[in-house]
């Protein structure tokens, strides 16, 4: 918030109704048994913050603000998508980074990993580092990046198998090799949650190259007791994540919470018709919120913009053009969850949005930098999806100007969930708040 204050914006923030959670050992489980607070968490708090902030701005400055922008990452990124869907007049522009917009299924993906890495299958931090090193060694430089990179530009083109690190009995690799249960767990990590009865995909898996971020997946054992909050809301605070059934229990969770927590609907027509602009960003080495979920959402936006739902080459180009008129996705090679990772994670996210909203100039490329000890070590362009940066073969490889945004990569399936897991259900009834006639008024700067 402080940074935006230095730019002379009026800034507001919300804890989404979870104030005790920051200090309570139960974390988000403090909302168990409190459905109204769960609605606050899902959507209402952000809209209420927006409306009340505009009232305060008018009272202080004597006039309503003329433009407003939303900025959020992870859960905050998901809130941005909820705003565009449910309250499309709240903001002129939205930056949604690593958006956790599919609440029930992102939690299911976490529980999937908790179960996979439980007990003897748990992977240590040293093993996770060895996995990422092996992944990069096999796949780097084949996807537009440099052969000297220590991250992947497009992990979707990488098919490294964790069996390559399976223990052979040699003493030299004892600390970093993988046992058979660990190999199986890593395969599930990349696969993502599947309904065991129907074989339907519930949610995307994790990308290769994301394994060693922030102690993940080694930290899963401790996270398991504090995360998965929405499961506790339905099954109670004694919920045992080891017993979660990805068929029946998943349906129970979705029946109870999907309409509140999930923003899967790829229909942003009202936001678009109001002139709203959406910038999506997601790190391609994010192990917390699967990048492939955001890619799938954007692909469904493209399909929705063909108007007849067709996805052949001609219609896809038409849908992409229409989508890029109001929404653009920028994938961040080597960037982990919101920031961090080996890739260039320092980016001015807001200025391109402001320029798009206020001057009508849509961003095709955005500069990203890697900064170490206050020094920029290299830069790369972030490219408007579906393009990714490719080294031109000439020029300083540490400079973004030596890369072009190119879309000629062959890519595999983006792990699209089954249709039933993209249904948000009926809109959850949002309790009205007063002074809803705020139309296009926006947060000041």
Each predicted region: which residue ranges?
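C-terminal His-loop and adjacent cap/lid subdomain of alpha/beta-hydrolase
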Residues: 1-445
């Amino acid at each position: 918030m402080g940074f935006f204050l230095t730019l002379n914006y009026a800034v507001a923030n919300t804890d989404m109704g979870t104030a005790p959670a920051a200090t309570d050992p139960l974390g988000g489980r403090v909302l168990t048994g409190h459905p109204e607070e769960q609605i606050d968490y899902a959507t209402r708090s952000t809209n209420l913050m927006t409306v009340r902030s505009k009232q305060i701005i008018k009272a202080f400055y004597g006039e309503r603000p003329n433009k407003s922008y939303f900025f959020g990452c992870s859960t905050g990124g998901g809130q941005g998508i909820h705003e565009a869907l449910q309250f499309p007049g709240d903001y002129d522009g939205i930056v949604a980074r690593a958006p956790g917009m599919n609440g029930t299924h992102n939690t299911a993906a976490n529980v999937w990993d908790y179960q996979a890495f439980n007990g003897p299958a748990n992977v240590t931090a040293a093993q996770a580092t060895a996995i990422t090193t092996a992944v990069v060694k096999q796949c780097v430089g084949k996807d537009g990046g440099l052969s000297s990179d220590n991250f992947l530009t497009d992990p979707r083109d990488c098919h490294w198998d964790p069996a390559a690190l399976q223990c052979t009995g040699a003493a030299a690799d004892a600390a970093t090799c993988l046992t058979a249960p660990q190999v199986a767990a890593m395969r599930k990590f990349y696969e993502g949650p599947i309904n065991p009865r129907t074989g339907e995909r519930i949610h995307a898996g994790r990308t290769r190259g994301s394994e060693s971020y922030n102690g993940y997946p080694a930290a899963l054992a401790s996270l398991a007791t504090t995360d998965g909050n929405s499961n506790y809301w339905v099954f109670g605070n004694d919920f045992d994540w080891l017993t979660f059934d990805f068929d029946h229990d998943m349906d129970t969770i979705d029946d109870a919470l999907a309409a509140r927590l999930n923003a899967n609907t790829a229909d942003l027509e009202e936001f678009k018709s109001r002139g709203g602009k959406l910038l999506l960003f997601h790190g391609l080495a994010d192990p917390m919120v699967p990048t492939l979920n955001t890619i799938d959402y954007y692909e469904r936006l493209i399909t929705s913009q063909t108007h007849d739902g067709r996805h052949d080459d001609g219609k896809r180009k038409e849908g992409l053009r229409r989508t890029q008129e109001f929404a653009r996705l920028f994938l961040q090679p080597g960037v982990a969850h919101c920031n961090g990772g080996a890739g260039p994670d320092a980016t001015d996210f807001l200025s391109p949005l402001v320029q798009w909203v206020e001057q009508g100039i849509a961003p095709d490329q955005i500069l990203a930098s890697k900064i170490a000890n206050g020094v920029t070590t290299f830069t790369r362009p972030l490219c408007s999806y579906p393009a990714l940066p490719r080294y031109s073969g000439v020029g300083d490889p540490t400079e973004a100007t030596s890369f072009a945004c190119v879309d000629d990569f062959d890519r595999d399936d983006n792990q699209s969930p089954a249709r039933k897991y993209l249904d948000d259900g009926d809109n959850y009834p949002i309790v009205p708040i007063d002074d809803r006639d705020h139309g296009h008024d926006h947060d000041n700067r």
